[in-house]
Amino acid sequence: MIARIWSGKSPLWLLLLPLSWLYGLVSGLIRLCYRIGIKRSWRAPVPVVVVGNLTAGGNGKTPVVIWLVEQLAHRGIQAGVVSRGYGGKAESYPLLLTSQTTTEQAGDEPVLIFQRTGAPVAVSPNRSEAVQVLLAAHPVDIVITDDGLQHYALARDKEIVVIDGVRRFGNGWWLPAGPMRERASRLRTVDAVIVNGGEALPGEIPMRLIPSQAVNLLTGERREVSQLPALVAMAGIGHPPRFFATLEQCGAHLEARIPLADHQALSIVDVDPLVTVNQNLIMTEKDAVKCRAFAKSNWWYLPVDAEFSGEKPELLLQELMSLVR
């Protein structure tokens, strides 16, 4: 229903317009307060790069963050990552992730980034505090924030926006009548726009999410998705249909598609009934970090990696490296 409203296919968005006007007014006043100095942003002693979006829902920010961390590491630059930690409920914040940190504490995306990259990661609703605890423990060269474009309390040196190239901005309205956190005109003030799938416009950086082999949660075995019989797919991400479409493009024959809420907490009680012993369950890597502790032998996940082409990604990396020098 939300997808239909935000795409403009349902007239119900008209009923939500008063709330959207209020959202736009409040968010605009907040930005104005920072712009004219009524509110002040905290500036970290190292460069800060924000990877965010203008819309609610999954656009592919986390794969971009992972790509940036890995690419900078290959060039000798140590990046740390901060996040709000959506879906996590730690006893106290800020929280510096360790190998024992759970998704219940830190949220799924920070744990995924930590496990994939090995980079220092800290979470807190106050991202400035997350940066401070991160820097106190790790002498990183640069900080990347996973989301936080609208968190103006943290000063930033570069802003990168990730857009879903298929959905773009939906009906173009602010939340809740539409998907927008800020208006599309905000793109004129950011440093780079990365478009995930679809068609990139002039000046934008095209990106694709490339899947690899499916990985068994229990054993680590790898198989081609097309070789997994009796397959049931589940996805607790911002836009589950994208994951299901990716599986089908890999040759999967899905017996069922189960969309879940983004950042939804998962337990054995939630997941185990989704498949029989004769079926295989496949999920996103973001869901896998929540399920690994109670995984079954017929549960798999599909890793994806951001892939770029052309010279623009390298130019972006050069810009980030110049901040450190």
UniProtKB/Swiss-Prot annotation:
Mitochondrion in keyword set: no
Enzyme class: transferase
SUPFAM superfamilies: P-loop containing nucleoside triphosphate hydrolases (SSF52540)
Record key words, sorted: ATP-binding, Kinase, Lipid A biosynthesis, Lipid biosynthesis, Lipid metabolism, Nucleotide-binding, Transferase
Biological-process GO terms, alphabetical: lipid A biosynthetic process; lipopolysaccharide core region biosynthetic process
Biological or metabolic pathway of the protein: Glycolipid biosynthesis; lipid IV(A) biosynthesis; lipid IV(A) from (3R)-3-hydroxytetradecanoyl-[acyl-carrier-protein] and UDP-N-acetyl-alpha-D-glucosamine: step 6/6
Protein name per its UniProtKB record: Tetraacyldisaccharide 4'-kinase
Protein's organism: Enterobacter sp. (strain 638)
